[in-house]
Amino acid sequence: MTDICLMFEVHQPFRLNRKFHSDLMALGKVTKKDLFSLYFDHKLNRHVLVRAAEKCYFPANSIILEQIDRYKREQKKFKVAYGISGVFIEQCERWSPDLLESFKQLSESGCVEFLDEPYYHSLASLHGTDRTEFVEQIELHHQLIRDLFNYEPRVVENTECLYNNAIAKTMEGMGYKATVTEGVERILRWRSPNYVYKAKDSNLRVLLRNYSLSDDMGFRFSSTLWEEWPLNASKYASWLAAASGQVVVLFVDYETFGEHHWPESGIHEFLEWLPGEVNKWDHLWWRTPSEVACRHAPIGEIDVHEYNTISWADLERDPSAWINNPMQTVCYESLKELEKSVKGTGDEDLIRLWRYLQMSDNLYYMSIKGGGPGDVHSYFNPMGSPVEAFAVYSRILSDLEARILVELEKPELTAKRMLRRLPIGKGFTFFYEFARPSGLTVHSLEEFYATLKTVDTSSIRFHIEKGDFERWLRQVVGDIKLSNELTNISKKRLRGKALRKRLLATMERRIKELKGITEGTSVRTKHRRRLKTT
């Protein structure tokens, strides 16, 4: 018996406003509430959603619901699964509430499973080692699906099927039982994707997308140059029947059915006839991802190191669709570096805008790959060229960064900003003397204080005489007061333990002072909230 697991990814990004700069100049004074309309091209976004709904979403939902109803009283039911991004649902709420209702009808059928995923279709799983932002976005998505469909997802998929061992550990730590990723040869070697595996050193079940059979439907279906064209449901079902193993995972973009392949291609008829053609084969059964994970014990482990992260994108099937060329890398790193600052503001509007800019689509448009992958990148790019995509994104990200910094300059946030952890490249590296690094680099005042306790006094003397500590505190950390205090200490010409002791006392006093300010702000904020509720 072979399970057939059919899954759909449903996503539309908020595309950026190419005229952002001119629109900004025309408006003059801009408030935070104006930024969502300024940063994104909602006329274009609405147009794309409405067009895709007409050609794809409504017809496909209708077909799937009809086929579920057709087989729901039979032994071999038709079942599917959806991964729907949070930003897609937001667009439905804005411009197509009827479409959202049709997804709710599917949820009520009892034959549809919903997967969790990062709310903003982001690359947050690649941000640092603790993956705090990744976890927060999945939790936001989980709450959305629960509220909207009264459904508790048990299986999670990452954006574009990005996967490695560390990501899997995070998913397991959140309580998920299974995930899905690409069945890449370099991790499978001689093994087949048509089995259930588990993550390395984990109990998380891993379902692997059969990309050959998935892409027959998702990419090659309407290609008249393909030797198997035209593809009908009967032929495709026979290919599924010939596949050995526990399960065949078919995972495609939902836009396959009417948007990527237009209705004239026969894709809707293919979808309509597929359940029945599969059910003609006695050993084929439709299953949801959680059913597959429960039915089959894993036959082995999938081992994917972080340096070998996989995805379902392009021929490389790695993160290079988004992080490859200098334009993509600069934007990705700049976006990541804003996390501490934007969250330090505590401003929900700014945090939400920063998260919208995390949508992987923005970096995808900057790809300069050639060949087949390049054609796909160009097809989806609303900016016309990778350079234009880079220019528009950079302008908007820079504008957001400037507004975040202005927010952080407010007195109540200044202390929090000084205590923040600095991004890579902004830390202080201790040297013993010129060209003799100690190997110690700190990224916050508290790390600086802790390192001063143990670093050799020759390093402290080297930096205090050159004014390095003061410059870093003033120009990078932004603590002018502390910088001035260290300048005064350097004038005293202290040496050895006496110098270390004076620096530590000054640092300890300043850190306590800053923490007291932030704690006082927190107390006042809580007090104001209590007043509002009484």
Task: Give the ranges of each region predicted by the language model.
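Short, well-structured secondary-structure segments
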Residues: D3-F8, P13-G128, R154-E157, K177-E182, ...
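Catalytic domains of cell-wall/extracellular-matrix polysaccharide-remodeling enzymes
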Residues: E136-P193, T256-W273
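Active-site and substrate-binding clefts of carbohydrate-active enzymes
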Residues: T2-K55, V87, N194-L204, L208-Y211, ...
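Generic structural signal for well-ordered alpha-helices
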Residues: N61-L65, L100-K104, V135-I145, A168, ...
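Metal-dependent polysaccharide deacetylase catalytic core of the NodB/CE4 family, i.e.
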Residues: K76, V80-E160, S202-F221, G245, ...
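Terminal, compositionally biased segments used for targeting/anchoring and flexible tails
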Residues: I404-T534
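Alpha-helical scaffolding within the catalytic cores
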Residues: I63, R94-S107, L188-D201, L231-W239
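Phosphate/oxyanion-binding active-site loops and adjacent basic polyanion-contact surfaces
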Residues: A52-A60, H127-I138, M217, L225-N232, ...
